[in-house]
Amino acid sequence: MKKRKILLISLLTMILAITAMGSSAFFNAEDTAHNVITSGSVKIAVVETMLDGTEVKDFPAEGITGVMPGSTVSKIVRIQNTGSAEAWIRVRVGTTVHSGEDAELDARVVGFSVEEPWVDGGDGYYYYTKAVPAGGETEELFREVRFDPNMGNEYQNCTAYITVEAEAVQTANNPIPAEGTVRDVAGWPGAEGVD
């Protein structure tokens, strides 16, 4: 009888334990939330076109040949915002001229006029004074390139290279500072505190 009592007590304890575990399972709940946060992108592309009569077409990759002193060549430069975020934009324009023998010549014989709303930042860059929306593009940086009418014989068979390098930074949480200009916004590559 003692064994039966112990067996009965053990059996009741097990039943109570199993019941308690089952009840505990009914009062527990679990859930997982997956949150996806995607940042915007700042991407740009230099767009170079030219006016051929009344038709605007892509500027030829091989350039223009047969340019004479005093010539003006159509070269329209804009910057397109291909990213998903609004951006501030600046550009640097480099000009080099190489003779037919590949000697570097004075590049001041090549000129262009920067259009509004672009401004010379005085630091080697031209700044676009308006924010450019995603998918949008700037107005023309310049529309034509001029060659000095006083170019000498050393410029025969020369090649002029005009390089346009563009940079962009986000406008979100990056306004033009009070009493500042677009040149003063944070994040420009090479600026203090920017890697």
Model-derived segments and spans:
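Surface-exposed, hydrophilic segments of mature proteins
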Residues: L8-S10, T19, F26-D195
